[in-house]
Amino acid sequence: MSHPIYELPIDVNQIQTLIPHRYPFLLIDRVIELDLEAKRIVGQKNVTINEPFFQGHFPTRPVMPGVLIIEALAQAGGVMTQLGLGRDALSKLFYMVKVDNARFNKQVVPGDVLILEVQMKRLIRNMGCYYGEAKVNGEIVASAEVMCAGARE
């Protein structure tokens, strides 16, 4: 199957045409690598002190919640799925239905650039299975296997 060529980086405006997430829950700022043949994507999230979750997690020592790092990986997988399958985000929603083997190795704090490396393992009907690693400065800070299911609006 021949895939269209996308000019990189894919910015946040283009990302918003592919997945339905919006501020404050859009957790991928750009796509910096994309290989649809290999079913691999690399996204980026610039973590700033202005993130709403830092107000309560934790006020005197802000740390990005691990579940949001996993969500960011799932969103990167969703972008890849939309680009690879040519689906319109308005007609198809993907819900995270399972997380396995989640590991959190290091805290993510304001000022970090979170790199989201996601590999699609399989796509069966409306179910996508992904493996993702989140990195800061080349070091794995979190990883997980994620399953997402598609559903009509």
From Swiss-Prot:
Catalytic residues, chain numbering: H57
InterPro entries (alphabetical): FabA_FabZ (IPR013114), FabZ (IPR010084), HotDog_dom_sf (IPR029069)
Subcellular locations according to the entry: Cytoplasm
GO BP annotations, alphabetical order: fatty acid biosynthetic process; lipid A biosynthetic process
Keywords assigned by UniProt, alphabetized: Cytoplasm, Lipid A biosynthesis, Lipid biosynthesis, Lipid metabolism, Lyase
Pfam families: FabA (PF07977)
EC number: 4.2.1.59
S-S bonds: none
Gene3D superfamilies in the record: Hotdog Thioesterase (3.10.129.10)
Any GO molecular function: (3R)-hydroxyacyl-[acyl-carrier-protein] dehydratase activity
Catalytic activity field: a (3R)-hydroxyacyl-[ACP] = a (2E)-enoyl-[ACP] + H2O
A cellular-component GO term for this protein: membrane
Enzyme class: lyase
Sequence similarity: Belongs to the thioester dehydratase family. FabZ subfamily.
PANTHER family recorded: 3-HYDROXYACYL-[ACYL-CARRIER-PROTEIN] DEHYDRATASE
Protein's job: Involved in unsaturated fatty acids biosynthesis. Catalyzes the dehydration of short chain beta-hydroxyacyl-ACPs and long chain saturated and unsaturated beta-hydroxyacyl-ACPs.
Name of the protein described by the UniProt record: 3-hydroxyacyl-[acyl-carrier-protein] dehydratase FabZ
